[in-house]
Amino acid sequence: MVTTTDFFFPNVDDPYLMGKIACANVLSDLYSFGIDECDNMLMLLAASTDMSVEDRAWSTRGLIEGFNDHCKLAGTKVRGGQTVKNPWPIIGGVATSVVKNEDMIMPVNAVPGDVLVLTKPLGTQVCANFHQWIRQPEKWQKIETIATHEEARTAFAYATKSMARLNRTGARLMRKYHAHACTDVTGFGIAGHSDNLAKNQLQPVIFEIHTLPIIEGMRKIDEHLGNNWKLTSGLSAETSGGLLIAMPEAAAKELISEIEEVDKQPAWIIGRVLACEPGENKSVILPNPTIIEVKPNQNFDF
């Protein structure tokens, strides 16, 4: 039995969409093991005591509906959970699946010669803040010479859809193409999660990241503000990010091609796995990595 628990406070102002993002985020931990079926979902919910009665009812209903609808899209359903009161809203869940050991991809078997695949672009946190600043003139004036409100809205619309996009296709294809290890990229950024994954490998390996796919325009914003989010250092937090997968290069190219065919979204080879001395496992992002500016699109099926 594999069980994962995750919850957080909203980072978008549409409760229905936030419910979808929360569901996708909870399921990503299962998906990172190559498990693409969730047998049971419990919802964890906090209703805000700092809101008016009307706003609390509206936002809580939206969170529940978004979470439930995305569970249906993922082929599962909410069968219980826990609701509490809290100063700010919280949404998340507990996802459980029962699988055979041979149907799981344990995150420990990367080998020298593997490549690293990333299935979603980086920059969601920058997008969220960028969009919020539209309503905060004192902050917007810091970037008004290099950005427009329309750019902020376009990037944010893409980022929210990316966050809500299920990593389910990636999970299924990991098994099909015999991936060696995987993690999902969330709050610790690509640098933190890749380092944790590298240190968890049975063989002495270094993960070397040479490419960072970033939502178009977010690098410009971060650099203009003195690398406040440290986006090109891989330290910017992500919400419901992509899968970081270690696997043979030929298989990686097949997986990327099929993700693009099925999900209508890009994926990238962003690094490679190298041998190292025992006890020195780590991940490094090369100085001046190649930056891919990922153009926003709305090719989503939800």
Give the role of each language-model region.
Residues 1-302:
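Helix-biased detector of long, well-ordered alpha-helical tracts
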